[in-house]
């Protein structure tokens, strides 16, 4: 599990209270405690080896983690059609996206939901100051930035949603010696999706997204095109979602280290499951996530495989 995800977990100091205390309150939310296992062989991941001795495919490193997730909502009106919130979105978690948000939501009478959010941890994490350094220990440095999101869900009760975001990132100690690979950047993201039901219990979501990653170095800039399909099944005592996606990343210029222009094919598969009929444990559920990502690049250095498995308990109020 990368340090971006861990930083998301660290920013969730949500306390658990009894369900009765929240029955007539404007507060609502959920909190989960998760433990799990992650594995990756990405040369760019700071959870991997500090020292690499070649610029080929990376070696596998494993990690065990214990971490919280959650969200807290406060209704601004008695009708509860306006809310401020912080935490991780259940909809995002269902498709394998972990992002801490501070935001505002408004429910229109026509079924549309407006969501405006600031995401402080999507960009902020640790990266290698020079990931291409060989034969000696690589040092980490902080990546800082800001991300802003605008989402319109279920437009006019049509099942269509539109998601847009803008983000910036700065590297504290950028030590890559090639101007073409400088990583400070601006990113623009847009995603459209459609949700439909197959029957009263099951449905699917199709989504397409585009990202323009405008970095200081042309060889670090890219355009990304992603297609995603999610299947979900809902019963009174459990919920299941399965998401698969394909993403094409096309970089803008030749990489000066490898003398070719990078191109990545990224495959993701994510399964989420929740069971909430625990005897004598009202408002509690068992949750589990399993996900894998394969990055197939035309440059061996960027090829990687990662695996994430997690199980935990969730409390909803």
Regions found by a protein language model. Give the residues of each.
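Short loop/turn motifs that connect adjacent beta-strands in outer-membrane beta-barrel proteins
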Residues: 20-27, 77-85, 107-115, 152-161, ...
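Outer-membrane beta-barrel initiation region
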Residues: 22-81
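Membrane-embedded beta-strand positions of outer-membrane beta-barrel proteins
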Residues: 29-33, 84-86, 114-118, 150, ...
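Transmembrane beta-strands of outer-membrane beta-barrel pores
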Residues: 35-39, 76, 88-92, 118-124, ...
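Outer-membrane pore/translocation modules
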Residues: 99-207
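Detector for outer-membrane/organellar transmembrane beta-barrel domains
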Residues: 157-163, 167, 183-254
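Outer-membrane beta-barrel "beta-signal"
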Residues: 269-275, 304-317
């Amino acid at each position: 599990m990368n340090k971006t995800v861990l930083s998301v977990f660290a920013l969730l100091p949500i306390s658990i209270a009894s369900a009765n205390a929240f029955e007539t309150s404007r507060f609502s939310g959920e909190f989960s405690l998760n433990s799990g296992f992650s594995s990756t062989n990405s040369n760019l991941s700071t959870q991997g080896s500090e020292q690499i001795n070649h610029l080929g495919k990376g070696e596998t490193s494993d990690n065990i983690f214990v971490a919280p997730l959650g969200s807290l909502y406060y209704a601004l009106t008695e009708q509860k059609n306006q809310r401020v919130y912080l935490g991780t979105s259940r909809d995002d978690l269902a498709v394998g996206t972990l992002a801490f948000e501070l935001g505002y939501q408004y429910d229109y009478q026509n079924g549309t939901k407006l969501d405006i959010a600031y995401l402080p941890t999507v960009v902020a994490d640790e990266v290698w100051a020079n990931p291409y350094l060989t034969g000696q220990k690589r040092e980490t440095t902080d990546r800082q930035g800001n991300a802003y999101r605008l989402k319109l869900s279920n437009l006019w009760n049509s099942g269509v949603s539109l998601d847009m975001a803008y983000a910036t990132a700065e590297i504290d100690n950028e030590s890559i010696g090639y101007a073409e690979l400088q990583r400070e950047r601006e990113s623009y993201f847009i995603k459209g999706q459609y949700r439909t039901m197959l029957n009263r219990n099951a449905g699917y979501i199709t989504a397409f997204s585009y990202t323009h990653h405008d970095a200081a170095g042309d060889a670090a800039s890219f355009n990304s095109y992603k297609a995603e399909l999610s299947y979900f099944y809902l019963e009174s005592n459990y919920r299941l979602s399965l998401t698969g996606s394909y993403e094409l990343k096309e970089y803008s210029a030749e990489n000066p280290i490898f003398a070719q222009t990078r191109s990545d094919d990224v495959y993701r598969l994510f399964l989420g499951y929740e069971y909430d009929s625990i005897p004598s444990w009202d408002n509690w559920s068992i949750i589990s996530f399993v996900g894998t990502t394969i990055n197939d690049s035309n440059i061996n250095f960027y090829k990687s495989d990662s695996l994430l498995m997690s199980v935990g308990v969730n409390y909803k109020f």
